[in-house]
Regions:
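Alpha/beta-hydrolase active-site loop
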Residues: 173-193
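Gly/Ala-rich beta-loop-alpha elbow adjacent to hydrolase catalytic centers
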Residues: 207, 211
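Alpha/beta-hydrolase fold nucleophile elbow
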Residues: 198-206
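Mobile gating loops/cap/lid regions near enzyme active sites that modulate substrate access
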Residues: 392-519
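Non-catalytic accessory segments of hydrolases
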Residues: 20, 28-176, 446-460, 468-477, ...
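Short glycine-enriched nucleophile-adjacent loop
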Residues: 212-223
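N-terminal secretory signal peptides and thylakoid transit peptides that target proteins
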Residues: 2-20
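Substrate-access "cap/lid" subdomains that shape
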Residues: 88-90, 191, 225, 230, ...
Length: 519
């Protein structure tokens, strides 16, 4: 056991004992099955497991680093989700800047149980999203996987990632506040999860899309070292972070959209949050689309790019799963929408061009795809090329950099199962989420609930929970990713391993450099 691990374990035992002590004279679990208790927290029973929702892990003023909040001695209800971070286009879900809450599902709140812990970070880039989505409720995963599941909300968009350091020391941690929130949540887990039946020495982080990108970034942040012991990213990569110059341009664009003078940071800090959210409609000064905020290379909290020029040394020993979905962009580029209407060989190159993130001649790209796959339709090539040139390269870079650095405990998957619910959707971005969580029947799932879906879900749950429990996926046939073989688990109705299954696409897109969108 390393000195770091030993320190975490000792601290956890002391703090977990303190959590339990606050429950006296009440028992660890209330006698009523409707009101389980762990220390200060009164939760509920959900689908056969104990659920504790809306647990505060920190509190923060706008644009400054969050801190843990001492307990004042009063009992705390933990029976509903806390509010999510303010954001655009999230309907009627309660939003608040006071959003630093997490949720726990556990089969048994016994401090001696020592179950592996799986901590989930949500997608939505760094801009939107929450863990209140029914697809990411943790009861099924906790029950069937025999693990403790934790899901975390944190600050997003300008509230979590606007770069304000040029305005002075008060804002020294800006640009990475959302990441520091996640680190604070992981510190809470390390300190308290034993009271919920979890093992603080077996904490796995996993996340989809933006959640995976947040994990990749944490793997290069010194303050995150030792707080998790395995990781899995699902269609979410972060090769480079934003540089401070681009980050500053985005801050100035936000302030201009809000009609603030360039130096009026007090106005930005004190304006109503609803008005601040309106500013997110501003155009991004660096790339097309709405204004983007994400992690910043500040040389303090994030002293290097996550996976450039190589994989961060501090995380090479962390066992890791990396995965992507075969046709990610079917979720972004609606097959029933205008970008696909009238698609033909005559216009496909022009329509591909704005969707790819690697600067290659789209006419040449289409020629290569037609040469390798002469039976593919324009639609098939459109989705393959936009996925391969937009959503997939980051995963290839991260896996290759880990392999090149000698990180042998790396496993890669490709999710191929098309939706049986919507045939035009194919296998699209987010479609692997319900298979891992076991939430096949949840609103928003495209998986269906047939026998094939249930069988694949069981396999993916074994893979992920196995990594959390043992540091290896729970599928013995899954070979580690090494060069030049590039073993890849193919998740479909048939689960199998293939070596470098998209070799020619990988080589095609490697002919030009990849620059992380938003950097």
């Amino acid at each position: 056991m390393s000195g770091t691990d030993a320190g975490i374990t000792r601290r956890t035992l002391v703090k977990s004992a303190a959590v339990l002590a606050t429950a006296a004279p009440a028992p660890l679990l209330a006698r009523s099955p409707k009101l389980p208790r762990v220390g200060r927290y009164a939760g509920l029973v959900e689908d056969g497991v104990l659920a504790f929702k809306g647990i505060r892990y920190g509190r923060a003023a706008r644009f400054v680093r969050a801190v843990a909040e001492p307990w004042d001695g009063h009992a705390l209800a933990a029976d509903k989700f806390g509010p999510i971070c303010p954001q655009r286009a999230m309907g009627e879900e309660p939003q608040s800047e006071d959003c630093l809450f997490l949720n726990v599902w556990t089969p048994e709140a016994n401090p001696r149980a020592g179950r592996a812990v799986m901590v989930y970070f949500h997608g939505g880039a760094y801009t939107t999203g929450s863990v209140t989505d029914p697809l990411t409720h943790g009861a099924k995963l906790a029950a069937d996987g025999d693990v403790v599941v934790v899901t975390v909300n944190h600050r997003l968009n300008a509230l979590g990632y606007a770069w304000l350091k040029p305005f002075g020391a008060r804002y020294a941690d800006s640009g990475n506040l959302g990441q520091l929130d996640l680190i604070l949540a992981l510190q809470w887990v390390a300190d308290h999860i034993a009271a919920f039946g979890g093992d603080p020495a077996r904490i796995m982080v996993f996340g989809q899309s933006g959640g995976g990108a947040k994990i990749a970034t944490l793997m290069a942040m010194p303050a995150a070292k030792g707080l998790f012991h395995s990781a899995a990213t699902m269609s979410g990569q972060q090769v480079q972070a934003s540089g401070p110059a681009h980050a500053w341009s985005r801050t100035l664009a936000l302030m201009a959209a809000l009609k603030l003078a360039p130096g009026d940071v007090d106005g930005l800090r004190t304006m109503p949050v609803e008005r601040l959210m309106d500013g997110l409609d501003a155009s991004d000064p660096i790339m097309s689309g709405g204004i983007y905020f994400g992690p910043v290379l500040d040389m303090t909290n994030l002293p290097r790019h996550p996976f450039w020029p190589d994989a961060a040394q501090q995380s090479l020993a962390i066992p890791m799963i990396l995965g992507n979905v075969r046709e990610e962009t079917r979720a972004f580029l609606n097959p029933r929408g205008p970008k696909l209407q009238g698609l033909s060989w005559e216009n496909i190159a022009a329509r591909i061009l704005p969707e790819i993130k690697i600067d290659l001649d789209p006419v040449w790209v289409v020629e290569q795809y037609r040469s390798h796959e002469p039976n593919w339709s324009p639609e098939q090539i459109y989705y393959a090329a936009t996925t391969d040139g937009r959503s997939w390269p980051g995963q290839v870079i991260e896996a290759d950099e880990r392999a090149a650095a000698g990180a042998s405990a790396t496993w890669v998957y490709q999710f191929d199962r098309p939706s049986p619910v919507d045939p035009l959707r194919g296998a699209a971005h987010t479609d692997d989420i319900p298979y891992v969580f076991g939430t096949l029947a949840a609103p928003g799932s495209f998986s269906g609930v047939d026998q094939a879906a249930r069988k694949l879900s069981a396999a993916m749950m074994r893979a992920f929970t196995g990594l959390a429990k043992t540091g290896r996926p729970g599928l013995p046939e899954w070979s580690a990713y090494r060069l030049p073989g590039r073993a890849t688990m193919m998740f479909d109705d048939t689960v199998r391993v293939e070596n470098d299954p998209r070799r020619w696409q990988r080589e095609l897109w490697a002919t030009a450099p990849y620059v992380q969108p938003g950097t």
